[in-house]
C-alpha cells in the first residue's frame, strides 16, 4: 500500500468519525483488518491491499490524532475559511483538511508540501473543482501562517 492510499484511507476514517458514536480505537480495530479490506476490495480498489505494519501505524496515528485534536483543527479550518462557518463546509472537505493540518502540526517527518498536495489530490476525487480550490486556499494560508518563524 502506498502512502497516498494510506492517507486516503485515513481521510475516509476521519470522515467516518464525523458521524459515528464508536470510539476511535474501536473504529480503527474494525476497519484495519485484512478481512475488512478483503470485503471492501470487491467494491473499491483502494482497499485492494491491506496496510502493512508501517502504513497501519501511520493510519492509526493520523486518525487518532485527528480525533484527539478535532476541536483545535476545526477552529483552524474556520479561522482560515474566511466568511464561512465550519458547519457549512462539506464533511469530506473538512476530513481532508483535518488530516493535512494534523500532519503539518504534529508530523514533522512529513513535508508540508506533501501533506497539502496529497490532500488536494484526494479532494479532487470527492469534491467539486470549486471546493478543491477552497481546500487548497485554506491549507496554503494555514501552512504559511502556522509554520512561519515566530518572532
Whereabouts are the PLM-identified features?
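N-terminal interaction/assembly modules
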Residues: 1-132, 136-151
Amino acid at each position: 500500500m502506498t502512502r497516498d492510499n494510506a492517507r486516503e484511507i485515513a481521510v475516509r476514517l476521519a470522515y467516518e468519525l464525523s458521524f459515528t458514536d464508536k470510539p476511535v480505537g474501536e473504529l480503527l480495530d474494525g476497519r484495519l483488518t485484512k478481512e475488512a479490506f478483503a470485503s471492501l476490495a470487491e467494491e473499491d480498489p483502494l482497499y485492494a491491499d491491506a496496510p502493512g505494519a508501517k502504513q497501519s501505524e501511520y493510519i492509526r496515528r493520523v486518525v487518532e490524532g485527528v480525533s484527539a485534536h478535532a476541536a483545535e483543527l476545526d477552529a483552524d479550518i474556520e479561522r482560515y475559511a474566511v466568511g464561512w462557518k465550519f458547519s457549512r463546509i462539506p464533511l469530506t472537505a473538512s476530513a481532508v483538511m483535518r488530516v493535512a493540518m494534523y500532519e503539518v502540526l504534529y508530523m514533522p517527518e512529513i513535508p508540508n508540501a506533501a501533506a497539502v498536495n496529497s490532500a488536494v489530490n484526494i479532494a479532487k476525487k470527492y469534491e467539486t473543482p470549486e471546493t478543491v480550490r477552497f481546500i487548497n486556499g485554506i491549507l496554503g494560508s494555514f501552512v504559511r501562517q502556522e509554520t512561519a518563524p515566530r518572532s
